[in-house]
Regions:
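Hydrophobic transmembrane alpha-helices and their membrane-interface boundaries in multi-pass
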Residues: 21-99, 105-112, 130-135
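Alpha-helical transmembrane segments of polytopic integral membrane proteins
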Residues: 62, 89, 165, 169-172, ...
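Short, Lys/Arg-rich, polar N-terminal cytosolic tail immediately upstream
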Residues: 1-16
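Membrane-interfacial loop-to-transmembrane-helix junctions in polytopic alpha-helical membrane proteins
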Residues: 16, 43-46, 70-77, 122, ...
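Membrane-helix interface segments
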Residues: 74-75, 101-102, 119-125
Length: 211
């Protein structure tokens, strides 16, 4: 006898999709807050203020578009959305004039997300796409390079990006606890099945087991 193992049901896939959605919303809120703080202090020009509503709207658009294709191949959808996030990261760094603190925070959020999703391989892909898009935008647009980041902008950027990392790490920890609980339940079911098999072996002849 074999115990019934939990499968990747539509419900579990939906939970994973919602977790990815909320994570992306938090990440883009952190980026939008950095841009809003920079424009408020007149560190960034008002010409890039459109990036704030875009950062707030894109995660919802990505979620609804991804849901159409996630049932066929969820891993490809996740990687494709991560690649788009990497393009946005490079685009944001270039349009912000490669401001030190926001650019580093953008890269930190992107790297952390890539490591959580797929390890070093996806991290390398994300950094390569981000660097390529940043270089392309810098060549085409030639934005002015900004100097030291003001304290207000740096504080907002670090605060929101740190909040994103802490919340994501917390949910990852909770997922690990649930996984450990499921493994314990599977182990108990296996032990129960083994005891049942031993008890049946006492009453059934060897010819029955060979059938």
């Amino acid at each position: 006898m074999k115990p019934t193992l939990p499968d990747r049901s539509p419900t579990s896939r939906s939970v994973a999709s919602m977790r990815e959605y909320y994570s992306r919303v938090l990440a883009y809120i952190a980026c939008g807050a950095s841009i809003a703080a920079g424009t408020y202090t007149q560190y960034f020009s008002y010409g890039i203020l459109w990036m704030v509503p875009y950062a707030l709207l894109y995660p919802h658009l990505a979620y609804h578009l991804g849901q159409r294709f996630r049932q066929h191949d969820p891993r490809k959808v996740t990687r494709a959305l991560l690649a788009v996030d990497a393009v946005h990261c490079g685009l944001g760094m270039a349009l912000l004039g490669f401001s030190v603190v926001p650019s580093l925070m953008f890269l930190l959020v992107l790297s952390f997300t890539a490591l959580v999703i797929g390890g070093l391989r996806l991290l390398g892909m994300a950094l390569l796409v981000s660097a390529s898009s940043a270089l392309l935008v810098a060549v085409l647009v030639a934005p002015p390079l900004l100097g030291n980041t003001p304290v207000e902008v740096a504080a907002v950027s670090i605060l929101f990006c740190g909040l994103y990392i802490c919340i994501t790490a917390f949910f990852g920890h909770q997922q690990g606890l649930r996984l450990a609980q499921v493994r314990q339940e599977i182990a108990r079911e296996q032990e129960k099945a083994a005891r049942l098999a031993r008890n049946l072996a006492k009453y059934l002849s060897p010819q029955v087991w060979e059938m």
